[in-house]
Amino acid sequence: MKKTYHLGATAAFGLEGVVANELKRMGFDAKGFHGGATFDGTLEDAFRANLWLRAADRVLLYFGRFKAVTFDSLFEQNKVLPWEELLPRNAEVYVTGACARSQLMSVSDVQSIAKKAIVERMKKAYSLNWLPEDGARYHIDVHIHQDE
C-alpha cells in the first residue's frame, strides 16, 4: 500500500473554492481554506494534481507539523521526520521559511537549523559522513505560525 500524505494546493485570493471543486472532481475529499485547498493523497496523486489543476498555483506536501518554541525542539523534531522517504542520498536541500506570531522569529536561524536537522537525518539514514548535495534540488519550506 502506498503512503498517504496531507497535501495542499495554493491559490490566488478568491479561487480557493474553484481549486477545492477541481480537486473534488478529481476524486479527492478536498477542503478549502484561506489561500487554497487541502486534501490527502499519495505522491502520485500530488503529481496528478500538479498536472491537472487549472486554478491552483502549486501543490505542496505537508510533511510535518509540531510545536516548536526553542531552536533545540525545532532541530530535534525535524530530525525525527523520515526525510529519506522523500529525498535521495545526494539531494541538494534548499530550505526557505517564514515566521509569524511565534517565539522563534529569526527566519535565517529557522532555515539553518531545519537544514542541519534534515542533513543529520539523511546522513544517519544513508550511513554517510557528509551529504554530497550534488543531485537534484529539493525545496523545503518551513513555516512557523503561533509556535507550530
Describe the role of every protein-language-model region.
Residues 2-137:
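Non-catalytic nucleic-acid substrate-recognition regions in nucleic-acid-modifying enzymes
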Residues 140-148:
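Core structural elements
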